[in-house]
Amino acid sequence: MLLSKNDILKARDFKMREVEVPQWGGSVMIKTLSSKDKGAFEQKTTADKLDLSTIMAEYCALIICDEDGKQLFTREDVEQLAEKSAAALELVFNEGRDLNTFTEKDLEALAGN
């Protein structure tokens, strides 16, 4: 069956996954990124002046969501999120990387900017 434009635009094509974060005493929901968000994140990570102190928090802010897939954190929350446990953020980051199919090659390309 060929899909129409309307079929494609109405498709619920985002995946979500619950991730247990022991450091925070519970779990969070994460989601796949939109093409727009993934592109913006990749562009940010290849910028000349990459801020490594907040990059994990920025990614986590993009993927942590409520049960309906609505993003919980805004850009304004990134600094506060960056103050949280590195182990907790790394756990969420790695789960998000897996869910969003960032390969090792993708990560090397991003890091190689």
Residue ranges and their predicted role:
Residues K15-Q23:
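Short acidic-hydrophobic surface loop/beta-edge motif
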Residues Q23-N113:
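Short, surface-exposed, charged amphipathic helix/loop patches that serve as local interaction elements
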Residues M1-K15:
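Extended acidic low-complexity intrinsically disordered regions
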